[in-house]
Amino acid sequence: ISYITRKKTIDGETLKNFDENNSTIDDYRPKIGLIPFENLNNDNDGEFLVDGIVEDLITELSMIKEISVATRKTCFGFRGKDYTSQSFKDEWGFDFIVSGSIRSSNDRLRISVELSDMNDDRVIWSNKYDRINTDIFEIQDEIVTKIIRCIVGEIEITSLKRAHRKPTENMTSYEYTL
């Protein structure tokens, strides 16, 4: 939301738009990006499922106000590109990345997911889900719900640990805390 004013200055002080003034409000929230999952079978059904899972993860995570989630357009722009953890952190500002893959054999389906901490360049959570390939929407809903429950907890734990070990740079803030 931006507020538009006709006056660009008040008493000689240049005004900034609302977005610029409040750009640091959400800086405390962990920033998460999702990489479109790899379809290891290269079939249309698998592609449909992996895209659906990532879209639903973006939707569900964006409902959690304590987490900042990259847009669908940004996330799907990562498809097929080879970024390093350092570039995700430096170029995009992500604290965490969710990635994964899907593969199938006959009527069996395996979805692998991992949550990586970009600050330490390490996987902090991963899991695999095996299902019978019946109702793709039911599978998608079940998997997304399980993933959300796990990764949100891991993000909170990691963020709390990170906040606990990072000393304040502002002594006035520290004195008020005491």
Locations of regions flagged by a protein language model:
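Short beta-strand segments enriched in small/hydrophobic residues
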Residues: 30-40
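Catalytic-center loop of serine/cysteine hydrolases
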Residues: 1-20, 43, 53-178
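A short, charged/proline- and glycine-enriched loop
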Residues: 25-32, 173-177
